[in-house]
Amino acid sequence: MVKYGLFLGCNISFNRPDVEVSMRSIFPALGIELDDLVGQSCCPTWGTMPSVDIVGWCAVAARNLALGEEKGIDLMTACNSCYGSLNEARHKMLTNPEIHRKVNEILATIGKRYEGKAKCRHVAWVLYKDVGLEKLKESIKYTLDGITVAVQPGCHFLWPSEVYPDKEEDPFNPKVLRELCEALGAEAPYYTKLIECCGMGALRSTDPEKSFKLVKEKMENIKEEIDADLIVTTCSSCLIQLDDAQERLRKEGKINFSIPVLHLVQVIALCMGFDPEKVAGICVTPRDEIIKRILENKR
C-alpha cells in the first residue's frame, strides 16, 4: 500500500473539516495509507513569511517536509497554497545551496535536518497517477452522469509549474481535473476563464471589491458558456471563495443564479457513498439539490 503524510494545512483544518473527512474516507478505500504527520504546522503560504523572510519560510517548510522525510514518505495535500509553498521552498533549497545550508543550521537547533528528498504531492495527482482513472471508476457507487461540471484547478495547482514534482500538466490547457471529473461520469467542458484566479488570498484581504469582481466575472462566464450544474476545484481557498462570494454577490443583486461548489475529494467521497453530512456538510451556496442528483445516479 502506498503511504503519504497527510498535510492538512491551516485552511482545511480551521475552515473546511469536511474536506479533511473526505480525504480520510476516500484514500484508505482507494489503497492509499495516510500518516498524520504529528507536529505539522502552517506551510507557510505566500503573502505571509515568504514575503519578508525567505530563509525563515524555507526553514518552516523544510521542518514540515522533514516530518515525512524521517519516515521515508512524501506529503500529500488538498490545499493548493500548501502544495505551492512547500514545493517552491524545496525548489529554492535544491537550487540554492546557501539557503539550504542556512535552513539546516536552523533545523539543527531542534534536532532536525532536511535533505531535499521528501516532496509534497497534490491529492489530484495522487488520484490521477497513483490510483488511476480506471480504479477510480471502479470504486464509485454513484456517478456524475448528466451533470455538467466547471473545473477550477486554481492558480497554485498550475503555477509555478517548474517547481512541482508532477510536471505533465500544461498550465495553459490543464487536463487532470477535467479527466478526473469525466472519470466520475461528468461532462467537464472548457470555458474561457477556466485558468483565471478566483480572487482569494491577499487580494480578498486588501481589496475585496476587486476580489469579488473576479468571482463575478468567472461565475458569469461559467453560466453563459457551459451552464454548469456544479463547480469542482482542487483548492480549498477556491472552494471557500467561490462558495461564499457568490452568495454575497446574489445578496447585492450582482448575479441572479447559484452554482454549488465542491472540492474534488468531496465529490469522490459522495460518489463512493460516504455520508453527505460528514463529507460535504459545510456550505454557503446550497448543495442539497446537486447532492440529491448525485445520489440518484446509482451505478
From Swiss-Prot:
Domain of life: Archaea
EC top class, as a word: oxidoreductase
Coiled coil: none
EC number: 1.8.-.-
UniProt xrefs under InterPro entries: Cys_rich_dom, HdrB/HdrD_reductase
A GO term from the CC aspect: cytoplasm
Keyword Magnesium carried by entry: no
Subcellular location: Cytoplasm
GO terms for MF: oxidoreductase activity
Chief site of localization: cytoplasm
Pfam family membership, one: CCG
Keyword annotations of the record: Cytoplasm, Oxidoreductase
Keyword Nucleus: no
Main function: Has oxidoreductase activity. The Hdl and Mvh subunits may together mediate electron transfer from hydrogen to an unidentified electron acceptor on the cytoplasmic side of the membrane.
Family: Belongs to the HdrB family.
Subunit structure and binding partners: The heterodisulfide reductase is composed of three subunits; HdlA, HdlB and HdlC. It forms a complex with the F420-non-reducing hydrogenase (Mvh), which provides the reducing equivalents to the heterodisulfide reductase.
Protein name listed in UniProt: Heterodisulfide reductase subunit B-like protein
Organism for this UniProt entry: Archaeoglobus profundus (strain DSM 5631 / JCM 9629 / NBRC 100127 / Av18)
Taxonomic classification: Archaea, Methanobacteriati, Methanobacteriota, Archaeoglobi, Archaeoglobales
